[in-house]
Amino acid sequence: EGLCTVVVKDDKTAAVVEVNSETDFVAKNETFQQFVKAVAEQAVESDAADMDAFMEEKWNEDPSKTVKDALVEKVAVIGENLKIRRFEKVVATNGCVVSYVHGGGRIGVIVEAETAVVNDAVKEALTNLAMQIAALNPKYVSRDEISEEYISHEKEILLAQSPRNQRK
């Protein structure tokens, strides 16, 4: 169980985090939800390359502590094991980022787009795209991640269907 949330800063930078709990009861707890938001706010400001570096950063809400210290403190307050499972930060250099969180924090999506124009219409289109991504649960985030084996397999399926589809 747990939650994910996204924080977007100045339409250029976004971070998504997932924080796990043992039960859905805790995931609905306001203290836990505020902590997840604080972790996302930390992530959007972070330059950490990985989770270990992120956990050792000074906690923005109390620089005398690390992110790890803040997590341990929340575990003591909430009384249940918690884990910051993952985070991802996206920075748009030539465009913008938008986000969408579905199901009260079950799925989080960030879309980065290169565009010369950033206005409400562009943001609305990108938000609609983010909603579709959440609904479709894609296997890959970018073209670069798709293996040649997968592409070949999909091409075989399409080629096999092609003669049948020509008659329709």
Language-model regions: role of each:
Residues 1-168:
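N-terminal assembly/interaction segments in proteins that build large macromolecular machines
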